[in-house]
Curated annotation (Swiss-Prot):
Known role: Transfers the gamma-phosphate of ATP to the 4'-position of a tetraacyldisaccharide 1-phosphate intermediate (termed DS-1-P) to form tetraacyldisaccharide 1,4'-bis-phosphate (lipid IVA).
GO-annotated biological processes: lipid A biosynthetic process; lipopolysaccharide core region biosynthetic process
Keyword ATP-binding: yes
Record InterPro entries: LpxK (IPR003758), P-loop_NTPase (IPR027417)
Keywords from the UniProt entry: ATP-binding, Kinase, Lipid A biosynthesis, Lipid biosynthesis, Lipid metabolism, Nucleotide-binding, Transferase
Residues that bind ATP: 53-60
Catalytic activity: a lipid A disaccharide + ATP = a lipid IVA + ADP + H(+)
Family note: Belongs to the LpxK family.
Organism: Haemophilus influenzae (strain ATCC 51907 / DSM 11121 / KW20 / Rd)
Intrachain S-S bonds: none
Official protein name in the record: Tetraacyldisaccharide 4'-kinase
GO CC annotation terms, alphabetical: plasma membrane
Length: 332
C-alpha cells in the first residue's frame, strides 16, 4: 500500500487496528516462548528465510543463493514452504520442476526448477518436514518464509529487506507493512538488504540479470540485443523489475503490474505485445509456460551477496555459524 511509505492520515485511522494486531501477535509469540503452546523441533537444522514486512523484498533469490552455497559446501538441502497461492487439494505436496504452479505455487516451483532440490509445501510445516525427510536425504532444511510461524522451532533466522523501502512507516499491519515491530530484528541472525545498504544491513544483495530466455523455445539472448518491448510483473515490487530493464537500455513501450502471485490467462497478455517482445520475471514465467507465444521472454536473476561494509566480516561469521550448526546435529 502506498500510504505505508508516507505520512498519510490513513495511518492514524488504522493505528487502533495495528495495536490490536500487535497485541495478538505478541501474545501468540509469548505462548510459544513460554511453552504454553507446543512447537515442533525438526531432526535436522532449520534455517528460516523470511521478511519483517509484506511484499517484494527479494526472498526467493536469497533462498536460491543460500541453497547453491550450501550445496557447494557438500550439504544436501531441502526446502519447505507455506506454498502461498497454491490451490492443491491435498497437503503436504512434494513439488518438482514439472508441478503445475497452480497446485504447487509459483515460488516453490521456481525454486525446484532453479535448484533441482526437494521442495515440499504445506500450511503445516511439521507435515512438510516429515514428508521431505521421508522422500529425500537432507543435511539441512530451509524454510521459505515462516519467520512468524512459531509452531516451527528454528536454528537460524535470515531476514530479507528492501533497502529503499526498509520498514516503511514503522507500523504493523494494517497501518503499516510490518508483521512484527522493528525491534524483532535484534533477535534475528542475519539481515540481507536488497538493492543497497541501510542501518540494518549485515550483507547487501544485488540482483544480476544475465540474459533473456524464450518461454516457448528456451532460446537464450543477451539483453543488449533488445532495444524495446513491453514488460509485465506479478511480484511484490513490480517497479523494481521495470527499472532493471530500463537500466539495461531496453525502452519499455508499456508496463503492466499485476498482483503478487497472479495466476495468468493467455487472454490477459496476448494483446499487450503482439508485435514486440514481452518481458516477464522468472516467477511469472513458470505460470505462463503452457500458453506462451513466440515473443515472450523471461529474465532470470542471480543474487550476489556481499558485505555491507568492507571492514566487516559478517559473511564469514554467518557461514561459521552454519558449519557449527550442522556439526552439532551430526554429533547428536
Amino acid at each position: 500500500m502506498p500510504f505505508w511509505y508516507s505520512n498519510s492520515k490513513l495511518i492514524w485511522l488504522l493505528s487502533p487496528f495495528s495495536l490490536l494486531f500487535w497485541l495478538i501477535s505478541q501474545l501468540r509469540r509469548a505462548l510459544f516462548s513460554l511453552g504454553l503452546k507446543s512447537s515442533y523441533r525438526a531432526p535436522k537444522p532449520v534455517i528460516i528465510v523470511g521478511n519483517l514486512s509484506v511484499g517484494g523484498n527479494g526472498k526467493t533469490p536469497v533462498v536460491v543463493w543460500l541453497m547453491e552455497e550450501l550445496k557447494k559446501r557438500g550439504l544436501r538441502v531441502g526446502v519447505i514452504s507455506r506454498g502461498y497461492g497454491s490451490k492443491s487439494k491435498t497437503y503436504p505436496l512434494f513439488v518438482t520442476k514439472n508441478t503445475n504452479p497452480i497446485e504447487g505455487g509459483d515460488e516453490p516451483v521456481l525454486i525446484a526448477k532453479r535448484t533441482n532440490a526437494p521442495v515440499v509445501i504445506s500450511p503445516n510445516r511439521q507435515q512438510a518436514i516429515e514428508l521431505l525427510l521421508s522422500q529425500a536425504e537432507c543435511d539441512i532444511i530451509i524454510s521459505d518464509d515462516g519467520l512468524q510461524h512459531y509452531q516451527l522451532q528454528r536454528d537460524l533466522e535470515i531476514v530479507v529487506m528492501d533497502a529503499e523501502r526498509a520498514l516503511g512507516n514503522g507500523f504493523v499491519l494494517p497501518a503499516g507493512p510490518l508483521r512484527e515491530l522493528p525491534s524483532r530484528l535484534k533477535s534475528v541472525d542475519f539481515v540481507i538488504t536488497n538493492g543497497g545498504k541501510n542501518q540494518y544491513s549485515d550483507a547487501v544483495m544485488r540482483l544480476v540479470p544475465h540474459f533473456a530466455i524464450n518461454l516457448k523455445t528456451n532460446e537464450k539472448r543477451q539483453l543488449n540485443e533488445f532495444q524495446s518491448g513491453v514488460a509485465i510483473a506479478g511480484i511484490g515490487n513490480p517497479q523494481r523489475f521495470f527499472t532493471m530493464l530500463e537500466k539495461l537500455g531496453i525502452q519499455l513501450k508499456q508496463t503492466q503490474a499485476f498482483q503478487d502471485h497472479q495466476h495468468f490467462e493467455a487472454s490477459q497478455l496476448e494483446k499487450l505485445a503482439e508485435n514486440q517482445p514481452l518481458f516477464m520475471t522468472e516467477k511469472d514465467a513458470v505460470k505462463c509456460q503452457s500458453f506462451a507465444k513466440d515473443n515472450w521472454w523471461y529474465v532470470p536473476v542471480d543474487a550476489e551477496i556481499i558485505e555491507a561494509e568492507k571492514q566487516r566480516e559478517n559473511l564469514p561469521h554467518f557461514w561459521a555459524k552454519i558449519d557449527k550448526l550442522v556439526e552439532q546435529y551430526r554429533n547428536g
